[in-house]
């Protein structure tokens, strides 16, 4: 959802609205909310705005607990937990000055952990250009390991709780996302809203606005629309085995058209 261009609020609202649809479908089939609720998990993206992303994750955890308890009647704590995986935002990676992507990914990874993610994937610095090299993939992994074992960020749950700014931002995101979920409910739920192109249109509009803000220089992207380099080095890129590519294309063609 976020990689397609949604805002943080839209990602939060649309993701949880989808969750509501799945839970309701399971309950309609007679499943016990306290049993299957423990096994639900979500997938979130982490974008560039450090504190907004932390607040988004905090709001998600709070909102999902309320949804499971108030809307669906869950009574067990584990059935109300918002378990989620986070991937750093591939759409924020830039082809220019690719080493800058290491910094972007590090900040996104740190925000994910501070927000309470249970698992994490860090993108490699060269993924805006090609499949990552082994060195780039290892650096992305080491980013996670340094955050986990050297920074102290993971020593305590929700370390930014009580921060006036973070708490206010969390409340704001929750209120905006809740209002958007209510709008989806008015459209008949997530599935019906998708059929009416509601989510798609909202995401498309947000993606256009965000790209326009970069193109106009309103949103600064270091190395892209500000602090450019006139002597850009050609980075090492993963070499593709063209023979293997051709074989796979042949197999795919045979699968699609066996005759």
Feature annotation, model-predicted:
Residues 1-111, 125-141:
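Helix-rich catalytic cores of soluble enzyme domains
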Residues 115:
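Metal- or metallocofactor-binding catalytic centers and their adjacent structured scaffolds
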């Amino acid at each position: 959802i976020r990689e397609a261009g949604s805002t943080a609020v839209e990602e939060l609202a649309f993701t949880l609205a989808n969750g509501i649809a799945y839970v309701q479908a399971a309950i309609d089939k007679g499943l016990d909310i306290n049993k299957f609720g423990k096994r639900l998990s979500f997938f979130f993206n982490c974008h560039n705005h450090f504190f907004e992303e932390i607040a988004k994750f905090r709001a998600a955890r709070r909102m999902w607990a309320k949804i499971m308890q108030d809307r669906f009647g869950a009574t067990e704590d584990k059935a109300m937990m918002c378990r989620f995986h986070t991937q750093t935002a591939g759409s924020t990676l830039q082809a220019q000055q690719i080493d800058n992507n290491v910094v972007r990914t590090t900040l996104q990874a740190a925000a994910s952990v501070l927000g309470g993610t249970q698992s994490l994937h860090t993108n490699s610095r060269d993924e805006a250009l090609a499949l990552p090299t082994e060195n780039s993939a290892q650096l992305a992994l080491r980013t996670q390991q340094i955050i986990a074992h050297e920074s102290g960020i993971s020593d305590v749950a929700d370390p930014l709780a009580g921060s006036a700014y973070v708490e206010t931002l969390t409340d704001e995101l929750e209120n905006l996302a809740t209002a958007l979920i209510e709008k989806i409910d008015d459209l008949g739920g997530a599935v019906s809203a998708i059929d009416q192109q509601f989510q798609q249109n909202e995401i498309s509009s947000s993606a256009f606005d965000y790209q326009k803000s970069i193109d106009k220089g309103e949103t600064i992207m270091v190395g892209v629309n500000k602090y450019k380099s006139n002597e850009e080095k050609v980075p090492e890129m993963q070499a593709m085995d063209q023979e293997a590519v051709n074989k796979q294309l042949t197999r795919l063609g045979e699968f699609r058209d066996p005759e």
